[in-house]
């Protein structure tokens, strides 16, 4: 007896389903799900896989997204505790880890998250040996180093979300002061994602007009307009949001999909993201910090050599020393 499906549809071809543009998200907490919905809304993948250790939440999140399939253009949304669901991913986004508590510095989280990564990374490598790894979990610079060490991947394929969000926050706050959309406000925050990030005031501009040329005190203590406070707001903003709503999610999700789009579409846009910067700016250790990187289908193909002041370079070096001080104590 022919089934309804057989009566309706005549099959012409036996297909083997191998995804071409699969994205996996490890961790279905607030950040992971913000990444997931952002990716789905941008139509970046032909398959999205979700992985977590909390099976009920994982299944619930998957079903909730699947029920919206009519409104999406991603034909397959899967999930599982077993990493075999991640097979053949082009991009794996890692958001899993111990959550930052109110008032806790990102660096306090380290060893707890290293232990989690020791389980996650080998499983990803096993099922998607050619993927790009995008690390979002905090402290992101150190955990990108950890992912690089454990995976054995070349450094171009291990990327930290780094200062992409810090720079976005900076441009938003700058735009609010000037009454200009953030897309037209240009400024870069480099170095460590978080407390010791470095604003490059010399490069801040609108329509190619340097703000430092118009206002030489920009970013200094002598500045009567206190533009330095904009960077302080950037540093404090995550703590403030965590204090108010318990965690951050939407902005980091949007920031991550911005990076995912550059990778999946080979856009070769420049982003302030965390990469191995040994040999740059007098840094001699294996540390990952954010510098402007060209991002495309192979991950990070190039870095842009930014002209920094002596003071900015010293801050970057200090960040590197702080991170290395922690990294060399880590138990793998």
From Swiss-Prot:
Identify the main location. Answer: cytoplasm
One matching Pfam family: Ldh_1_N
Q: In which pathway does it act?
A: Fermentation; pyruvate fermentation to lactate; (S)-lactate from pyruvate: step 1/1
As its record notes, the protein acts as a catalyst of: (S)-lactate + NAD(+) = pyruvate + NADH + H(+)
- Record PTM text: ISGylated.
UniProt: NAD(+) binding residues: 29-57, 138
Report the locations given in the UniProt record.
Answer: Cytoplasm
Q: Does the keyword rRNA processing apply?
A: no
| EC class | oxidoreductase
Entry EC no(s) = 1.1.1.27
What function does this protein fulfil? Interconverts simultaneously and stereospecifically pyruvate and lactate with concomitant interconversion of NADH and NAD(+).
Q: What is this protein called?
A: L-lactate dehydrogenase A chain
């Amino acid at each position: 007896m022919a089934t309804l499906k057989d009566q309706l549809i005549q099959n012409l071809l036996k297909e083997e389903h191998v995804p071409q543009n699969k994205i996996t998200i490890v961790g279905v907490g607030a950040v992971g799900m913000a990444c997931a919905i952002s990716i789905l809304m941008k139509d970046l993948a032909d398959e999205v896989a979700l992985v977590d250790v909390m099976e009920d939440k994982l299944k619930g999140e998957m079903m909730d997204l699947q029920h919206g399939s009519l409104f999406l253009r991603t034909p397959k949304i899967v999930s599982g505790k077993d990493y075999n669901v991640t097979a053949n991913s082009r991009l794996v986004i890692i958001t899993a880890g111990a959550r930052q508590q109110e008032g806790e510095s990102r660096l306090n989280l380290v060893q707890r998250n290293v232990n989690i990564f020791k389980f996650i990374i080998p499983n990803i490598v096993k099922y998607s040996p050619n993927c790009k790894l995008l690390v979002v979990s905090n402290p992101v610079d150190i955990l990108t180093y950890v992912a690089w060490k454990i995976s054995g991947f070349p450094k171009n394929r291990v990327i930290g979300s780094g200062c992409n969000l810090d720079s976005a926050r900076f441009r938003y706050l700058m735009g609010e002061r000037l009454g200009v959309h953030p897309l037209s406000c240009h400024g870069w925050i480099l170095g460590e994602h978080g407390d010791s990030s470095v604003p490059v005031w010399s490069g801040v501009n609108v329509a190619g007009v340097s703000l430092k040329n118009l206002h030489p005190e920009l970013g200094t203590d002598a500045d009567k307009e206190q533009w330095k406070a904009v960077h302080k707001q950037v540093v404090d903003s995550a703590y403030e949001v965590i204090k108010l709503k318990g965690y951050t999610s939407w902005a980091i999700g949007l920031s991550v999909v911005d990076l995912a789009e550059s990778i999946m579409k080979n856009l070769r846009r420049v982003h302030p993201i965390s990469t191995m910067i040994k040999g740059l700016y007098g840094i001699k250790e294996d540390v990952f910090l954010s510098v402007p990187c060209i991002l495309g289908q192979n991950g990070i193909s190039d870095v842009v050599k930014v002209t920094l002041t002596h003071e900015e370079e010293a801050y970057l070096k200090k960040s590197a020393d702080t991170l290395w001080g922690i990294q060399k104590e880590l138990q793998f």
